[in-house]
Amino acid sequence: MNQKTLKALEYDKIVEILKNMAKSTPAKEYFENLIPSTNLADIENELNKVDEGYRYVLKYGNPPTLEFENILPSLKKSKLGATLNPHEILQIGKVLKLSYEMRSYLSYTQDFSFLESMKKRLVNLKEVISRIDQTFLTADEILDTASPRLKEIRDRIRKLESRIRDELNSMIRDPKIQRFLQEPIITIRGEKLLLPVKAEFRNEVKGIVHDQSATGATLFVEPFVCVEISNQIRILKSQEKEEIERILQEISSLIASYCDEIETSFYALVELDIVFTKAIWAKEMNASKPVINTSGIINLKKARHPLIQKDKVVPIDIHLGKDFDVLIITGPNTGGKTVTLKTVGLFCLLCQSGIFIPADEDSQLCIFQKIFADIGDDQSIVQSLSTFSAHMKNIIEITKNADDKTLVLLDEIGAGTDPEEGAALAKAILKYLSEKGSKVIATTHYGELKIFAQQEDRFENASCEFDVKTLKPTYRLLIGIPGRSNALVISSNLGLDKGIVEMARGYLSQKTIDLDRIINEMEQKRKEAEENLELARKLKLEAQALKAAYEEEKKRFETERERIRKKAINEAKEIVERAQYEIENLFKDLRKLAENLKEKEVLKELEEKKREYERLIQSISQQEKQEAESKTKKTLQNIRLGQKVYVRSFDAVGFVESLPDSKGNLTVQIGIMKLNVNISDIEEVEEGEKKVYQTTSKNVKLREKSVDLSIDVRGKTSDDAILDVDKYLDDAYTSGLRQVTIIHGKGTGVLRQAIRNFLKRHPLVKSFRDGTYGEGEQGVTIVELRD
């Protein structure tokens, strides 16, 4: 990959962004020197690393800030036994701390093989970290805690310095001495504490003169009383320096003992910084890992140039190498042709550098050994074209080096010279590159190349869409449709006299008019196809939504039906258990009574009645067993139209309306409903067979005691009373009662009339009448239920 191509495709701008995003000095150097690879294994390996980093960042957030310098020279020094300076030691300490933080961040790498391997290379040297932390506050300040000896020396220095201050303060407070001083203050020259003495009183303050003012009027004197103390401090300062040197040597030796582990950890951090920088950029750009191939196929979906603002970039779909090898793009200036070239070329470079591309996940790219781009002299996305000579100089180099593993991008091929000669040259160059096996994308204004692309094998036309109504490009790439100049339409829309426009149209050749008409028809058909595709997509989504709603409703119905069934069985069990308990107690009492009366026949009859009740009690369990068995019956093998069948999922009997299809689906009519069911969901119903959903007489008898013979609705409104009566009649009928009493009172007769109007329409009511004397007369209604 030559530097001219990298710059023309603005690859350098992307790596500069990544360099600035990287935190460590080595990672920044990596991006500064990053160039695309041509080795398939290396590219796939790098993309897989970034993919792990990308997925990990999405799931667990961004990593710690990996800001550190290159510590390899310092590690080499420590290996040789040299003493490291504080800055070098602190940088090594930073790497060790970041290793610890990164290990913690990478706590969930079980499903991330690369990150797991990196985590294992990160050392946890708490001993070294602790030693560095207790030694340094900054690179310029070593703590007293660095060693007991250092603390002792510094404590002595501080005490002596305090003595000097006390002596000097005593002197400046002395009235006899104050008159010899310029000011009653202590001044510092170098590391000495001195008094500012007036020059004329030099001999009045005994001491050593260390400095004087610029005018010579003030002498800075160290009194003799402080000199001895200062000498002691000087000796201690020398000892302090020696102790610090010893501490630095000690820490350097400690680092040297772990040099290999630290170096391994350093390299792991650098690689992690690189990978996570690429991953975070991919997240910000909504980029994805491209699918790699070696067959020369490019298929980009929703590709977005990363240097165009997100709110302005228009995604493009472009493919090359499968059905055609040369794509000729035509269209207006600033319509997106150059952006398309740069997008394809840049994406190939990014992919071969192990960087995700801002496109849909299933986008494909080929690994090219060479990529050439002729896009003008340092032309940015919307700058003017280069000269003909500059174009030809680049194209000559391209034709000499192109082969079947080459991608060639040519912007405005043949431009800058006579149109006829330029078009001829363009045809020859494109034909030559096609015969070499290169993959080529070229932009042009020449109409002849549109026809050329239609005639040549493995060539295809494309255009950048232009809205003649708004007079603006849409930046959409339309493959298979050559571009139109739109000059006459645009001129007319801008207000050019219609006569001039028609005159210009008359100057067009018939060939040009026919071509323009064909292109227009193709574009209309494309728009119709897009509209139909969009309509089909919407209809598909609606159908999927309806299907999902149906499935959800069916599931809800089945769940509710099962809940009601289980509830009914549980209620029946409770009634049975309660009845069993009452029966047991009753028989105990009767047995005692019979024994006392010595009536063996009575006792025998009671025992028989008990056995009968026990048989009744087992009916619920028998019903459950029958229901379970019904679900395991074999499905029908031979089905005929009109056959009576039981549909399990609806718990109902119906009739076959249509025979099963190849998938076993058929239509069954249940009542007024026609349902599509599967053959596995139905079973045969023989004549006289009673399904488990039919109520048996035994079960009815068991529930007789649970429903009263009458219901009292006095004092209620007509609506509330009717609701209660309706439920009561259902319960009474289910329990086997055939005559019940509704107590509504006499009153005004409104409630009685409302109830009787309701009873006239009730399907369970056979007849009803007033109560007789002793039954409640007109205050009640006696209801006879159907069998």
From Swiss-Prot:
Start and end residues of each Smr domain: 711-786
Entry keyword set: ATP-binding, DNA-binding, Endonuclease, Hydrolase, Nuclease, Nucleotide-binding, RNA-binding, rRNA-binding
Superkingdom assignment: Bacteria
GO biological process: mismatch repair; negative regulation of DNA recombination; rescue of stalled ribosome
Biological function: Endonuclease that is involved in the suppression of homologous recombination and thus may have a key role in the control of bacterial genetic diversity. Acts as a ribosome collision sensor, splitting the ribosome into its 2 subunits. Detects stalled/collided 70S ribosomes which it binds and splits by an ATP-hydrolysis driven conformational change. Acts upstream of the ribosome quality control system (RQC), a ribosome-associated complex that mediates the extraction of incompletely synthesized nascent chains from stalled ribosomes and their subsequent degradation. Probably generates substrates for RQC.
Family: Belongs to the DNA mismatch repair MutS family. MutS2 subfamily.
HAMAP family named among the record's database cross-references: MutS2
Name of this chain's protein: Endonuclease MutS2
